[in-house]
């Protein structure tokens, strides 16, 4: 019901619903003061009349606010149970192509638009883990590194992986249906998941390049996936540009930094991100490797890509 270009209530759509803009409250933008803590919260916490500031609307919005980008020639990947990949734009990108590719336009900070696509993520692995002997992430990754590369590939966003009774069986069935050997060992499953996610990321980066008004020269990874070194290297290899990691706690950082901006600690989003970059002591950069091998793998991925 909001016009993405004017950022105001869309009178035409409201009229179709028999409503008027006056029926709704004033929209609050990120970085604006909403008020102060209620008297009840003040009493319970002893904090007093602390100002309450609007942040970037929800977890992903706050996480993207904390992406340590240096310029607009970057894409971001919020990597966790789900993956959200996109770019930050000054204007919404609304076209037949963006509709066809199923990208959304979501409000960001300082009037920006988050043009993004939802992708599957660690959901695949999380649903497999209960079916295996108890293993930590380090053990899972070590087992994957020992296995043959690109033995089995899947479309992580295929409908059959949305909520199957058994994720391992769903992966096996997909592989059989596409003429591939099904994973048998834990390491083969993990490698299949990581390589397939990385190749799906390449597919989405190529979609973004069709929509983006500027070149995409690097990908920033934030969220829990920023700590997954194997997946990040696979991603750099697949997309052919450097992958740079931000914080695994980007949602909390973005939330706090918008409050800091309201308080005058920083004046702009560029200052905010410069402060975040200077504070990161665990950021890593992954350069693309084995480009020809991964180009061949991408062709195989496309050949077995099915919606199922």
Q: Model-found features: residue ranges?
A:
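Short beta-strand to alpha-helix junction loop
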Residues: 5-6, 30-34
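A conserved helix-loop-beta module that forms one wall/lid of the active-site cleft
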Residues: 14-31
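Active-site core segments that coordinate phosphate-bearing ligands/cofactors
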Residues: 3-11, 15-16, 39-218, 227-251, ...
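Small/polar loops that bind or transfer phosphate-bearing groups
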Residues: 29, 223, 247
């Amino acid at each position: 019901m909001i016009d993405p270009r004017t950022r105001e209530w869309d009178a035409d759509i409201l009229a179709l619903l028999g409503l008027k803009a006056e029926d709704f409250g004033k929209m609050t933008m990120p970085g604006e003061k909403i008020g102060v803590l209620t008297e009840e919260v003040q009493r319970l916490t002893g904090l007093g009349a602390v100002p309450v500031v609007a942040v970037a609307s929800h977890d992903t919005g706050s996480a993207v606010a904390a992406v340590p980008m240096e310029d607009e020639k970057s894409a971001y990947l919020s990597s966790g149970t789900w993956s959200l990949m996109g770019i930050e734009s000054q204007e919404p990108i609304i076209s037949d192509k963006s509709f066809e590719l199923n990208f959304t336009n979501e409000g960001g900070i300082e009037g920006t638009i988050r043009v993004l696509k939802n992708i599957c993520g660690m959901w695949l692995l999380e649903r497999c883990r209960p079916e295996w002997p108890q293993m930590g992430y380090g053990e899972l990754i070590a087992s994957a590194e020992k296995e043959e590369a690109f033995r089995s590939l899947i479309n992580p966003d295929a409908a059959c992986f949305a909520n199957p009774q058994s994720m391992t069986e769903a992966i096996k069935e997909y592989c059989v249906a596409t003429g591939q050997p099904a994973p048998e060992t834990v390491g083969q499953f993990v490698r299949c998941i990581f390589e397939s996610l990385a190749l799906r990321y390449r597919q989405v980066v190529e979609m973004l390049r069709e929509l983006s008004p500027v070149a995409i020269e690097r990908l920033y990874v934030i969220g829990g996936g920023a700590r997954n070194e194997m997946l990040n290297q696979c991603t750099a290899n697949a997309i052919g540009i450097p992958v740079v990691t931000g914080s695994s706690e980007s949602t909390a950082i973005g939330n706090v930094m918008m409050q800091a901006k309201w308080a005058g600690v920083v004046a702009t989003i560029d200052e905010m991100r410069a402060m975040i970059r200077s504070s990161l002591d665990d950021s890593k950069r992954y350069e693309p490797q084995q480009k020809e091998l991964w180009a061949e793998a991408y062709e195989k991925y496309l050949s077995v890509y099915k919606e199922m």
